[in-house]
Each structure stands twice: as C-alpha cells, then as structure tokens.
C-alpha cells in the first residue's frame, strides 16, 4: 500500500454486538511493546502480508467473540501490568470496540500500544469516526505492513524496516509524525 494514499475505508468487521472477535491473548508479554504487557490479538486482517507472524488471525470469521469487560477484568487482575497491546489481525477493523476498551484502560493508568498494517497517514486520512477515536486512544503505534524483503530482527518491537514506532499523542498535536524512542 502507498503510505501517502488517503485511507477512505477500513473494513469494520469482526465485532458483533459490542463484543470483540479475537484470536487470543497473552497475559504477560515483554515483546509486544515496552514494559510488562497484556496483548490482545484481534481476529481478521485485510492485509495478509506474506510472511506474517500471525497468519491464523487473517480470517474475519475465525477466532472467538469476547466481551470487552472480560478482557478488562483479566487486565486489572494483574497489578504488575504497565500496558496493553492491540495486535492482530488488524485492530483498526474493530476500532469502535477497541477505542472504548482503550479509554477504560487509560482511566486505569495503562498505556496502549497498537500494531497496524495501515500507515499513520492512512489512519489519519480515514473517514471512519471509530478509526479516529481508536487512534486518539493509542500511545504508541507500530505502523505499516510487514514486508518480508525488509525483515530485520535487530529492530525493537517491529519485524520490518518500513514499520515505524510512532508517538501518537505527540504526532496528533504536531500535525506530523513524531517517532517514539524506546527506552534503553
């Protein structure tokens, strides 16, 4: 996908009746963002990147439906968690449910990281209000599709050189991309 192209539509599927369609969760991740994290792997992805680390998450009808409140209870049950990561699949395909969940997580002092095959520019150019709401709740966005030709195992928190770690609040405030600098 062309990162300068306006994103006019992001397929909003997978969620049903306020529930989230997920492939699974990891209760104690240290690889899906900084700190000790709870990771939610959403189900459904339109990108189907060759070499994807999670190809089982591509099917929009796969996975299972869960109540966001159940995930919230699991997260809050662990006082050691520093944040929650939305991965996939493509989280922005279930933007409305995730935006509401992210707002509750923020209220409880947790930060939000989100992996997306869309670029920051595509997301900010998207017309769906729910996509904008989710983006406003994200602290760090790992953007862009995984590109096998740019695979780089030395990168922190990303798989290929085209992907960026973006400080979303600073980027939204400045009107341009502000890269996030990992600690250490």
Segments and roles (model prediction):
Residues 139:
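Receiver (REC) domain switch/active-site residues of two-component response regulators
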Residues 13, 17-24, 36, 54-134:
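Conserved Radical SAM active-site core
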Residues 2-41, 50, 54-60, 177-178, ...:
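N-terminal [4Fe-4S]-dependent radical SAM core
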Residues 26, 145, 169:
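Residues at the C-termini of beta-strands that transition into short coil/loop
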Residues 94-106, 113, 151-184:
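P-loop/Walker A phosphate-binding loop and immediately adjacent motor/lid segment at beta-alpha junctions
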Residues 78-86, 142-148, 172-184:
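Conserved C-terminal portion of the radical SAM core fold
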Residues 119-121, 146-150:
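Short Gly/Pro-enriched loop/turn and capping motifs at secondary-structure junctions
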Residues 47:
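Glycine-centered loop/turn positions within well-structured domains
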